[in-house]
Amino acid sequence: QVLGLEVIAENYRQERDSYKLDLRLPCGSQIELFSFANPPQRTSRPEACGLRHLAFSVDDVDQVVVYLIAQKVEVEPVRVDEYTGKKFTFFSDPDQLPLEIYQG
């Protein structure tokens, strides 16, 4: 809800003791999220190698940061990409997966 995603479906998969959540983004794209009772430990720093975070393009990073803070989300200080000159920052989802917002 904080990110404005619509829940399409949420299903419990008993054989795996896990949930699958289908979400629709405002642009119409969909994301599938899975939960697992005992996932393996892994590095989840934003700059770790491999798939370790999701990034969302936004028009105004500062405006989204104000909104997230109002929703009681802890947000890292906004940084500026040294190559593009565009703003970005990170925050964490409830499972501590880093999420990024960057200036589109």
Task: Show the residue positions of the predicted features.
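Core segments of cupin and vicinal oxygen chelate
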Residues: 1-29
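Short catalytic micro-motifs in class I SAM-dependent methyltransferases
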Residues: 3, 53, 100
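A short, acidic/glycine-rich surface segment
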Residues: 9-10, 16-19, 38-44, 77
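Residue-level preference for beta-strand/loop junctions
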Residues: 15-17, 48-50, 83
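Vicinal oxygen chelate
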Residues: 21-29, 43-104
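Short hydrophobic-acidic sequence motifs that mark active-site Asp/Glu residues
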Residues: 30-32, 98
